[in-house]
From Swiss-Prot:
The gene coding this protein: rps14
Keyword Plastid: yes
Region (Disordered): 28-59
Name of the protein in its database record: Small ribosomal subunit protein uS14c
Residue stretches of biased makeup (Basic and acidic residues): 28-45
Length: 100
């Protein structure tokens, strides 16, 4: 189980990313439209003004059950060992575990 502080930090990053998403998107569109380099540099400076943790690349996908940051399956939102346990217990409808 991940520490609660790390999970809360990740939630804070998600909130910040949602808050500054439109500002980042509009700044990137402006950079594409402006022909001169000096104006692009000004807009780029504006793009760097939001907090660092509001960047979407800072987000990390975590297991919603344990908070584990690695080996998380996108389709289920679970880490590998929790997914395996849930498949053995038949808690995920429609999913079958391959065995040979």
């Amino acid at each position: 189980m991940a520490r609660k502080s790390l999970i809360q930090r990740e939630k804070k990053r998600q909130r910040l990313e949602q808050k500054y998403h439109l500002i980042r998107r509009s700044s990137k569109k402006e950079i594409k439209k402006v022909p001169s380099l000096s104006e692009k540099m000004e807009i780029h400076g504006k793009l760097q003004s939001p907090p660092r943790n509001s960047a979407p690349t800072r987000l990390h996908r975590r297991c919603f059950s344990t908070g584990r940051p690695r080996a998380t399956y996108r389709d289920f939102g679970l880490s590998g060992h929790i997914l395996r346990e849930m498949l053995h217990a038949c808690l995920l409808p429609g999913a079958t575990r391959s065995s040979w």
